[in-house]
Structures are given as structure tokens and as C-alpha cells.
UniProtKB/Swiss-Prot annotation:
Gene3D superfamilies recorded: Mur ligase, C-terminal domain (3.90.190.20), Mur-like, catalytic domain (3.40.1190.10), NAD(P)-binding Rossmann-like Domain (3.40.50.720)
A GO BP entry: peptidoglycan biosynthetic process
Protein's UniProt keywords contain Cell wall biogenesis/degradation: yes
Subcellular location: Cytoplasm
Residues that bind ATP: 134-140
Name of the encoding gene: murC
Biological role stated in the UniProt entry: Cell wall formation.
Keyword annotations: ATP-binding, Cell cycle, Cell division, Cell shape, Cell wall biogenesis/degradation, Cytoplasm, Ligase, Nucleotide-binding, Peptidoglycan synthesis
Protein name: UDP-N-acetylmuramate--L-alanine ligase
GO cellular component, one term: cytoplasm
Family: Belongs to the MurCDEF family.
Source organism superkingdom: Bacteria
Length: 494
């Protein structure tokens, strides 16, 4: 198969204006911002950043000679100007409010200010790019593409919204001409990109804080589609099939008139056996070593992107057996008191459905994990954003009703103001309407949640912790307790 990547890299480089020698990131600890900062630091730019939350990412940045300010105050900008002068660039994300002290000071001094998407666009223009967008599966799909490229000896630059197991990082500064990145649709900024290959995994209304309705989202995705040299889209998604026609289709349901099909044959909750077809021609039987039908779709998308980029299937197959999910995507954390702890980033009803579906398959197929045979699905869900919770409250309840025991924590606001009557208890109320017999708990804080987990769960439970906020702290606290009590199990799921 010929590559659909054009040979215009040199022309792109000639058109691309360079960035100022020093770049300051407001909120540098975020998953997207930190990846950009690390790439630019390795390219030789002087980098600084501020973040009020301590995490391992900041430590990594400091190890790479990035200066970190632990607060976001006006004096940070003054300090930077003393050292670097006014020829600096300030980078912000959509999460940074207009009244941020550093941002206000940068505006006062008339400094150059750019959105993070403009920095990503700058990097895209310098490479042959594969840009992944869509409502769900962006991080997993871009992780898969990066992994397959790497095992095909293509050494890509990668900017990913999660930790890629191969690199144990959210970025890679490769030495080839390829760049793989996610295009975040949450704020509409993806229309700034001009990808060689664009890929849309699926389309569903999620970010109700930015989009009025599904039609509004579709119009934005159409703009992105028009800017792609070659567009790969998911035939199995009604919203894509009916509204956005790509250059190439992939599917896990259909072979006829499909460019890349990956049809499932067997599944046991940890891997899927599938038949691979190109333009209706059978190519091979392959084993995808990750669970979940949605992850098979992500794998099909990744294979399609690699083939369109010109990578031989025999080279792709070498990497398929090495595929692993990124962090917090049905991630097995280990055993806690003979309960299996799993974390997932699910924060939309469809994502919760997908995560619970994997858990159900594990139980139905009696697949033994970490020396236990899971028998019940216990879900711990942290709603993310008041606006999303209000919009999808009934849908959240319907998805969670497929569990055997449910804990719903207070809403992670992500900077949003509270909405009267919208909280964890209102979801619990909707859940009771669907299943009056379901055991539901709505604790007011993490301390009470941990107490309830100890009291209400039993051995052989599969405890599925879901959410896009800081709910991962729960598993950390549970395992920390084991360490403190010298009861830690070293039997971590592979």
C-alpha cells in the first residue's frame, strides 16, 4: 500500500516561523502541557512553567532543566523577564482562567501569548503528522499507533494524553520525520491543525460546556476533516458514517466496502482473536493482547493509520503483540485484601458501559486474574464536571445499574461552579429508579468512601474505579494502607 503522507516536510519547515528562545507554560503539570514542554526542552528551547499541584511530572520536568514555579503569581513573570528579557512566549491551555495572575501580568507587559494548541500546530507543521481525534479512544489509539511505529523502527515524535507503557511517558522525541498526536475536540482547537493523516475514532456529544449540541460538534469535526490530507474514519459510528466521509474506512463489524476490517472471533476478557482484512481481502488472524471490543476498534484504527502511512503489515504485526493500554485505561492495579483493583478514565456513559463490559466478560468467562476469580462488579464512580453530570445524569445511572454494588463520590468540578440539585446523590436517586434493589452509597468525602469500601466489599470482588479527576487517589490510599500494615501483595496483574 502506498503512503498517503506527502513529501512536503521541507516546504513546511521553510514556512514555519520559529518560537522565541524562552517559553513559559502556565499549568505545566497537565498531561498535554507537560508533553509539549518536554519536546521543546529537548529541542533546545529554554523552558519554565508553573503549577500549584505537585506530581511526578513536575519532578521529571525539573530533571530536564525546566524551571518550575510552585505558585502562579505575578512575580513569576517578573523573574522570567529579568533573566530572559521580553522575547519570551507564554503558553496557556483552556483550563487557565482569564483572571490568572500570571496571564494578567503577561497581558499587562504585552508579551506573546499562545494557546497550547498553537504550539502543537507549530510542531505538526515540522513533521509528517498523524493526528487522532474523536470523542472516545484518542489516547488509546494514539498510544497504539506510537507503539506500532516504534516496533517498526520508525522512531516517531509522540505527544499523547496519557502514559504510553513503551516509554513510561506521555511523550517521545523521536528522530524520524513522523509525529503522532491527539487533537483534543473538547474546546474546538483541533481546527488549527493541518494533518497529513487525520483519524476520527468516533463521534458523540460529551463536552457540553463547549458545544451546544451534537450538530455543533459535528460542524467542528467537519472543519477538522477538511484540513486533513487523508482522513480515516470509523464506519461503525453512525454519527461519523452519516456526516463525515473520510478517504478511508475502518470497521470491526463489516468487511464489504471497508478499507481496513478487524473482525472479532474470540474474547476472554484479556485478549481478542480477530481476522484482519484489507479491501475485503483476508490478510491474517491476529491476537490483540488487550480486553474490550472498544479497544479492538482502537486497534483497527491504529493499524489503518500505520498502513496508510506506508508501514508494511508484517512490520505492524510485530508490534501488535506488544500493545498495552495507556495508564488509567482498564489498568490492573493489583490485589487489595483479595479484591482486584482496576482503574479506568471513564467519565462519559459510553465509556462506563465499555469498562463494565470488560469486567462482565472477565466474570462470565471465569478468567482468573491475580490468583482470584472475580465474582462481583463493584463500581466506584467520580462524576467529572457539573455541566456533564446535569446533561447525562440519567445515562450515568443507566450505565452504573449494570454493577452489583455502586459507590458514587462527590463531583470533581474541574473548575466549574456548582449547579443546584446536581450531585452524587442525584445520580444515586436516578439509579434507584432503575434498580431499587441495587446497593448504592454516596459518601461525602474520600475518608468515608474508604471506610465503606472496607465494610461493604468482599473477597473476589472486581473493584472498578472510574473517573477523570483525582479518583485514582483512592487506590493509592488503599494500597498505602496495606504497605503500612505490611500486608502488601506483590501479585500485580500482568
Amino acid at each position: 500500500m502506498k503512503s498517503y503522507l506527502s513529501n512536503d516536510t521541507e516546504a513546511k519547515l521553510k514556512k514555519t516561523k520559529d518560537l522565541p528562545p524562552h517559553i513559559h507554560f502556565i499549568g505545566i503539570g497537565g498531561i498535554g502541557m507537560s508533553a509539549l514542554a518536554m519536546i521543546l526542552a529537548q529541542k533546545g528551547y529554554s523552558i519554565s512553567g508553573s503549577d500549584q499541584k505537585k506530581n511526578l511530572t513536575l519532578k521529571k520536568l525539573e530533571e530536564n532543566k525546566v524551571h518550575i514555579f510552585p505558585t502562579q503569581v505575578e512575580s513569576n513573570i517578573d523573574e522570567i523577564l529579568k533573566v530572559h528579557g521580553k522575547n519570551i512566549l507564554v503558553v496557556k491551555s483552556s483550563a487557565i482562567h482569564q483572571d490568572n495572575f500570571e496571564l494578567c501580568k503577561a497581558k499587562k507587559y504585552n508579551l506573546k501569548i499562545k494557546h497550547r494548541s498553537e504550539i502543537l500546530a507549530f510542531l505538526i507543521e515540522q513533521k509528517k503528522s498523524i493526528i487522532v481525534s474523536g470523542s472516545h479512544g484518542k489516547t488509546t489509539t494514539s498510544t497504539y499507533i506510537t507503539t506500532l511505529f516504534s516496533y517498526a523502527n520508525k522512531s516517531p515524535t509522540a505527544i499523547i494524553g496519557g502514559i504510553v507503557p513503551l516509554y513510561k511517558s506521555n511523550y517521545s522525541c523521536g528522530n524520524s520525520e513522523f509525529l503522532i498526536a491527539e487533537a483534543d475536540e473538547s474546546d474546538g482547537s483541533l481546527v488549527k491543525f493541518n494533518p497529513n493523516i487525520g483519524l476520527i475514532t468516533n463521534l458523540e456529544l460529551e463536552h457540553v460546556d463547549h458545544y451546544l449540541d451534537l450538530e455543533d460538534l459535528i460542524e467542528t469535526m467537519k472543519q477538522f476533516a477538511q484540513k486533513c490530507e487523508c482522513l480515516i474514519t470509523n464506519f461503525d459510528c453512525d454519527n461519523l458514517r452519516d456526516n463525515i466521509h473520510g478517504s478511508k474506512w475502518f470497521s470491526i463489524q463489516k468487511i464489504i466496502n471497508i478499507d481496513f476490517a478487524l473482525i472479532p472471533k474470540e474474547s476472554n476478557g484479556c485478549e481478542i482473536i480477530a481476522e484482519y482484512y484489507e479491501k475485503e481481502k483476508f490478510i491474517d488472524v491476529i491476537k490483540i493482547p488487550v480486553p474490550g471490543i472498544h479497544n479492538l476498534s482502537n486497534a483497527a484504527a491504529a493499524i489503518a493509520a500505520c498502513r496508510v502511512a506506508g508501514i508494511l503489515f508484517k512490520d505492524i504485526k510485530k508490534g501488535i503483540e506488544k500493545l498495552k493500554l495507556p495508564s488509567r485505561r482498564f489498568e490492573f492495579k493489583g490485589l487489595w485484601r483479595n479484591r482486584l483493583i482496576v482503574e479506568d478514565y471513564a467519565h462519559h456513559p459510553s465509556e462506563i458501559d465499555a469498562a463494565i463490559s470488560i469486567a462482565s466478560t472477565i466474570i462470565e468467562t471465569k478468567h482468573k486474574l491475580s490468583k482470584i476469580l472475580p465474582r462481583r462488579i463493584v463500581t466506584i464512580f467520580q462524576p467529572h464536571r457539573y455541566s456533564r453530570t446535569k446533561k447525562f445524569q440519567k445515562e450515568f445511572a443507566k450505565s452504573l445499574s449494570k454493577s452489583d454494588l455502586v459507590f458514587i463520590t462527590p463531583i470533581y468540578s474541574a473548575g466549574e461552579d456548582k449547579i443546584e440539585g446536581i450531585n452524587n446523590k442525584s445520580i444515586g436517586h436516578e439509579l434507584k429508579k432503575i434498580n431499587p434493589n441495587l446497593e448504592i452509597y454516596t459518601p461525602d468525602n474520600n475518608q468515608n468512601l474508604i471506610k465503606l469500601i472496607k465494610e461493604q466489599t468482599i473477597e473476589n470482588d472486581l473493584i472498578l474505579i472510574m473517573g477523570a479527576g483525582d479518583i485514582n487517589l483512592i487506590s493509592e490510599n488503599l494500597f498505602l494502607e496495606l504497605i503500612n500494615n505490611k500486608l502488601i501483595s506483590n501479585d500485580i496483574a500482568a
